Structure formats: C-alpha cells, structure tokens
Amino acid sequence: MLLLTEDGIIAARDRWGRTPIVIGKKDGAYAATSESSSFPNLGYEIDRYLGPGEIVRLHAEGVEQMRKPNEEMQICSFLWVYYGFPTSCYEGKNVEDVRFDSGLKMGQTDTSEVDCTCGIPDSGVGMALGYAEGKGVPYHRAISKYTPTWPRSFTPSRQEMRSLVAKMILIPNRAMLEGKRLLFCDDSIVRGTQLRDNVKVL
C-alpha cells in the first residue's frame, strides 16, 4: 500500500510479504513500486526491499522506518513462475534468471529424447531457453503469441471466454512443429486453460 502525504510517501507491505514493495533511489529522489522493472528507464536503482509488514516513509532526504518487518515471510512463488515481468526482481532474485535456472536444472537431469525445446509465451520461454542449454538441444519458437487484442487467459470470469482467449492468443508454427520430437515448457498452472488447448493443437 502506498499513501501520498504532504511530506512524502508512506509505503507499507502486507504482513506476510506475499506481494513485494521495492524502494528505488536516484539523486535527490526515492520511489516505491511492486515491480522493479519500472525503475531502469526512470533512472532509479534498487535501494532495498521492504520486509513483511514493514512500513516506511519516503522523502527527498531519505527513508524513515515507521514499523520494523516481521520475521516470517510467505511470498507468492507465482511472482517468479507466472506473474512477473522478466526484468523484475523480487527479494533480490531476477524473474528471468529463476525461470532459466529452473529449466537448466530440468534439462541437465531429464532423460527424454527430444529434437528441440519450445516455450509457451511469455513466461514459459525463459524456462525453455534454460532447458535447451541444459539438455544441449536447440530452442525453436514453435508457438508465437498474438497480444494486441487479448487479455491474460486466466482473467475472464467465464470459462467460455477464457477458452476463446487461450485459443486465439497463441498461434502454432507448423514448419517448426511437424516431424519433430518437441519438449514444451509451459506455466499454465492457474486454471490450466492454455495447457489443455495446446495439447489438442499438438
């Protein structure tokens, strides 16, 4: 939660730290956001992450702690796996780096025989790139995402609309798919809508 006051901004993180708040700093200014990806183009550097339940006041002179953080944290793992933008960092861990490392470890240990690996965009791509490196196989962009007119497939309230969005948002490339043993990395774990449709297409 962020509150704008006459003498600064009060930033408060939820008691369990499930969602992040990160403080950015540049000459003569501080900023607070839930996504560190908003900082680079504005000239801010990450200064610190608020702890669970921590409250601070930001002003031009610095950061004043109003409440100390709780000891226990229950941050949402979906931030790295699903929701997070690739350039964002949560608790000092970059989203794309976590996805890549997860795929890398799978590729190093998986015994499946595959010709190439593919990622279901967007968040499955980082994991697939890591898998390809760990497995020693090429990465192919066999499914592309068309986003100008469609929201995230898990957000519509009706299943009929979720299924339509999932179907229309991803376009398979037959030239990259046909005759190949493919391994797909997918993050369709909220409702599983895209996973079911992609299996049918393949």
Question: What positions do the PLM features span?
Answer:
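Generic non-transmembrane alpha-helix signal with a bias for helix starts/N-cap capping motifs
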Residues: 124-125, 195
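PRPP/pyrophosphate-binding module of the type I phosphoribosyltransferase fold
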Residues: 164-202
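N-terminal segments that mediate ammonia production and transfer
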Residues: 1-124, 132-167, 172-173
